[in-house]
Each structure stands twice: as C-alpha cells, then as structure tokens.
C-alpha cells in the first residue's frame, strides 16, 4: 500500500473517531441516555469524575439519574483533540469544556477537563474501550479542583 493511500486511510479513520466524539457531545446535550451509552463497549473501563474509581461500561439507570440532575442541556465540548490510529486501535486526548446548570443551582457550571479515549474497531465500528476524565487539583494542601484552568 502506498504512503498516500495509508495517509488517506488514517485521515478517514480520524474523521470517523472525531464523529464518535461529536456524537457523544450531541447525546449529552440532548440527554439521550441510550445515545450516550452507544459508543461504549459493555466492558469499557471508565475513569470519570464521579465515584467509584472505575466504572465498567455505562450503567443506563445511573447515567439517566445524572442527566436528570441538569436543568436544560449539558454542553460538553471537545477541544484540541489529537487522534492516533494503528490498525483497529486508536487513542485520542484533549480537553472537554463542561457547561450547564444543575437543578436548584444559583450559578451555572463551567469548567475544563482533560480527556483520554481509547477505541477499538469492532465489526467495522469504533467503540470506546477506555475513557479517562480528570480535573487537576492544586497541590498546595487545599486539594481544591483547579476549575479555573483553561487550555
């Protein structure tokens, strides 16, 4: 296979993966729990902001409960995602900005997170097998989350 063909294939795969990420954004905005869960494998290792330390796959009831704590849409917008693909494995990392208003809250929520996704092509579709989301915290002894940081 020529270098040009391989580069075209890699570019196509990156577009497919970015479409998965965009679909996640739309699903959360629309609070559609089934679309939120769709790109994840049943055994995906998910290290997100909420306890416990690791989730395995998406728990539909738990995710719906979380979606229902928001008044209006939830905006989780990707930025500066870098995608690397090798065969049927891909990983990407970048930032996610989260904006929304929790029910009963006086102020909207708005902060940046770091995001890493590992995907595997299964039966022709890219599926998330690993997700790690984090917010840095200040190392000054306060353990405050660094919600003021921006990319």
Regions found by a protein language model. Name each.
Residues 1-8, 24, 28:
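Juxtamembrane and targeting peptides
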Residues 11-20, 30-88, 95, 107:
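A solvent-exposed, acidic/Ser-Thr-rich amphipathic alpha-helical stretch
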Residues 24, 63-66, 78-83, 96-98, ...:
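Hydrophobic/aromatic beta-strand elements that line small-molecule binding cavities or substrate pockets
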Residues 29, 98-104, 119, 136:
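Beta-strand elements of well-folded, non-transmembrane domains
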Residues 40, 46, 139, 145-146:
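Outer-membrane beta-barrel domain signature
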Residues 112-142:
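Short beta-strand edge/turn micro-motifs at domain boundaries
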Residues 149-151:
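Extended, polar beta-sheet/loop recognition surfaces of beta-rich domains
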């Amino acid at each position: 296979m020529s270098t040009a063909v391989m580069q075209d294939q890699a570019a196509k795969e990156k577009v497919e993966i970015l479409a998965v990420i965009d679909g996640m954004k739309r699903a959360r905005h629309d609070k559609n729990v089934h679309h939120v869960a769709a790109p994840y494998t049943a055994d995906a290792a998910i290290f997100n902001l909420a306890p416990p330390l690791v989730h395995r796959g998406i728990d539909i009831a738990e995710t719906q409960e979380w979606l229902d704590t928001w008044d209006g849409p939830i905006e989780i917008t990707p930025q500066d995602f870098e995608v690397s693909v090798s065969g049927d494995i891909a990983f990407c990392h970048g930032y996610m900005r989260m904006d929304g208003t929790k029910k009963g809250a006086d102020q909207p929520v708005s902060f940046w997170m770091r995001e890493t996704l590992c995907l595997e092509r299964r039966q022709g579709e890219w599926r998330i097998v690993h997700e790690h989301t984090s917010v840095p915290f200040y190392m000054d002894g306060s353990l405050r989350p660094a919600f003021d940081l921006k990319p």
